[in-house]
Structures are given as C-alpha cells and as structure tokens.
Amino acid sequence: MGIKGLTKLLAEHAPGAAVRRRVEDYRGRVVAIDTSLSIYQFLIVVGRKGTEVLTNEAGEVTSHLQGMLNRTVRILEAGIKPVFVFDGEPPDMKKKELAKRSLKRDGSSEDLNRAIEVGDEDLIEKFSKRTVKVTKKHNEDCKRLLSLMGVPVVQAPGEAEAQCAALCENHKVFAIASEDMDSLTFGARRFLRHLTDLSFKRSPVTEFEVSKVLEELGLTMDQFIDLCILSGCDYCENIRGIGGQRALKLIRQHGYIEEVVQNLSQTRYSVPEDWPYQEVRALFKEPNVCTDIPDFLWTPPDEEGLINFLAAENNFSPDRVVKSVEKIKAANDKFSLGRGKLLAPVANLTGSTSTAGKEPKCILGGPGQVMKARSPLQVCKSSSLNFIHDNSKAFMLGRRSGFLRISTYASI
C-alpha cells in the first residue's frame, strides 16, 4: 500500500520534486529494483484468463518466471544494470496489515467460488486476481532465474524498499525503482516510478529526489516521516479524518506528531488507543537493513542452466529461451559487463523534462569495466560474509546475525 495519498499530495505541494524521464536516460546506471510488487503483478497479469494461468507439466504456476524473464531482458536491453532486492521478514508492526490482506483474500476466494457457480466471467476474472498470493517458492524461482541470467540478487533481512533505500543512501546504486511511495519515507535519495512497467511505453519514468521533496514541502526528514505516518502507512492506524492534506497542514503548523496530538480537537478526532507512532517513526529511521555491502557484479548468462530450468523443468519453448539468452548477450556486449560505476550529478540528462520547468543536474555513468576472468575456485571475504566463486557460482560460508544474503553475483 505504501503511504496513502502521497503521490497526489506531492503533485500538488511539491511539483518540482517529480521529473519525467525516458528509460534511456538511465543507461549505464545501477538501479535497485523492489521485486515484491513485480512478482505479484506477473502472477495477476501474465498469461491469466479467469482462473486459468500459465503452468508447467506439474501444474505449478510459471507466470512469474515468464514475466521476470521478459522484464529483465528489456531492462538489460535498455542499458540499465539492475539489482533485484527481495523482501525478508516483515516487521512485527506490519503483520496486522498482512493479516487483513489474508482475510481479504479469503473473502475473495468465497466470492470467486460463487462467481464460478453462476458462470459470471467478469466476476471470475475480478475475484481470481484478488486471491493471488506470492509464495516463498515464487520468490526462490525468481532468484534462481535472475542468478542464471547473471544479474545480482539481494535478499534483504527486512523490507525490500528499506534495503533499496539503504543501497541508494550508501551509493551502491544510482536510484531505486519501486511503486511503493514509502521508499521516500525510508530515505531513498533517488526514487523511480514506472521504470519496471511491462511495456516501457505506458508511462514515462517519474523520478523523485527526496531532497527536493523536503525542500518544496518545507519539511525536515523527521517531519516528512511524521507526515507519512499521519497520512497512513502499512505499520499502524492513522487518525480517522486526517488524510494527506490535513496531515501536511498540521505538521507545518505544529512540527511533530506529539504536538499535533496535543493540539487536536478531542471532539472531532480520536487518536487510536496505544498508537505506536513512535515505534513506526523508529522503523522508518532505522529499518532492518544491511549497509556493509560488497560491490555488485554482472556476469554472462548461464545458457545451459537457463535451458534446463526454463525449458526442461518449466516447459518453456527452448527456442524462446535461446532467443532470450541471445538478447542478454547482445545487451551485455553493447553495454559491457562488470561492476557498475556511479558518477556525481554534474550535468543535464538529454531529453529530460521537469514537471516544474526545471531540469535536474545529472550525467549518465559509464558502463562498468569488463570483468576479468576468475580462477576456477576463488575464496572472497568481507567483514561479514564469505563466498566461494567457481566461475559463475558462489556459496555463502557464513554470515553474522541479521546480515542480508547476496546472490551468486555479488563481487567482493
């Protein structure tokens, strides 16, 4: 869900914080991608007709694999260096929201059964989508696919969008791509919406910079976090009757939630009992993420592994898999493999237009250096992780408590 009404609020009160861009403007850039919503979208959209979905011979759904393959190929062909970040354990405060979603799915399942009984195809289509749930297997399938494609994968210890924001804050990536606006609340320096659109054509990419958001709203980061909590987020109830517009006015007037609560009309508004806004504030400011992160590395696709996984195990057309591999290789040859480079913003991006008539100052980073050949077996170490590399694979030897896991293609 993210932050209720934040997109509309920023469009009205911070229009200069959003910049329309082309996908090509991010050529050569390293972008962290929040995968959680993407996989859900694939399961809903790709190959679905009513209750019928794409499956392999074992009856297992493969829509997520088809969607992830196609989208990743298009991202690579655009010259973008993606790093896919997966959700870890949700914070305790989010479990109530997840329980609500589960109950809603259960209700949709009952509605779906009734729609099937009466043969209402429109309702079948509607309710079948509402019953979709992303499972651990869906996530593991996508991690395996991405690793075979030679693309870095990060398993976050907590929320993926929080980990993406940490990667951006620590200059491991140029920007993060997600549809959840709470990426800004977690402090993402540069946040992209619509970058991972299935077609790349439906909407231009919208780029937000948190510094410009704060400047135009006239708030500090702490006040912006309180604004988001008041507006409504995934981690606690908000005060009924207070939406984004009212929340912004109150924060500008009183500064922080404590002062807002003290000055609220007790007859008009009812503050939730034991409202954990302080814990939610701490979660946004200090989420469960890792900051000691090795450099990312992109490698050639494992053609044999992809054919075995997609064609042999999941009944994809072998010819289609080979064509996808050829596209990945062509993109890698064109933009080069290796480590991504991030350059400081110093010049305009070609073809970019600001919604406020101003253009941000940035330049495109050059492609990463071509990866040197590895020895057949190489042990790499960091302060927290050990990896063994055997050309294209890496196996973790150990990790500290609470540390994230990085896939095969994270170079140290």
Curated annotation (Swiss-Prot):
Coiled coil: none annotated. Residues 1-105 are annotated as: N-domain. Keywords: DNA damage, DNA repair, DNA replication, Endonuclease, Exonuclease, Hydrolase, Magnesium, Metal-binding, Mitochondrion, Nuclease, Nucleus, Phosphoprotein. The keyword DNA damage applies. Its cofactor is Mg(2+). One of its GO terms (biological process) is base-excision repair. It comes from the Eukaryota. DNA binds at R71, E159, G232, D234. SMART domains: 53EXOc, HhH2, XPGI, XPGN. Residues 123-254 are annotated as: I-domain. Mg(2+) 1 binds at D34, D87, E159, E161. Binds 2 magnesium ions per subunit. They probably participate in the reaction catalyzed by the enzyme. May bind an additional third magnesium ion after substrate binding. Its EC number is 3.1.-.-. Mg(2+) 2 binds at D180, D182, D234. Structure-specific nuclease with 5'-flap endonuclease and 5'-3' exonuclease activities involved in DNA replication and repair. During DNA replication, cleaves the 5'-overhanging flap structure that is generated by displacement synthesis when DNA polymerase encounters the 5'-end of a downstream Okazaki fragment. It enters the flap from the 5'-end and then tracks to cleave the flap base, leaving a nick for ligation. Also involved in the long patch base excision repair (LP-BER) pathway, by cleaving within the apurinic/apyrimidinic (AP) site-terminated flap. Belongs to the XPG/RAD2 endonuclease family. FEN1 subfamily. Interacts with PCNA. Three molecules of FEN1 bind to one PCNA trimer with each molecule binding to one PCNA monomer. PCNA stimulates the nuclease activity without altering cleavage specificity. PANTHER family: FLAP ENDONUCLEASE 1-B, FLAP ENDONUCLEASE FAMILY MEMBER. This is Flap endonuclease 1-B. It comes from Oryza sativa subsp. japonica.
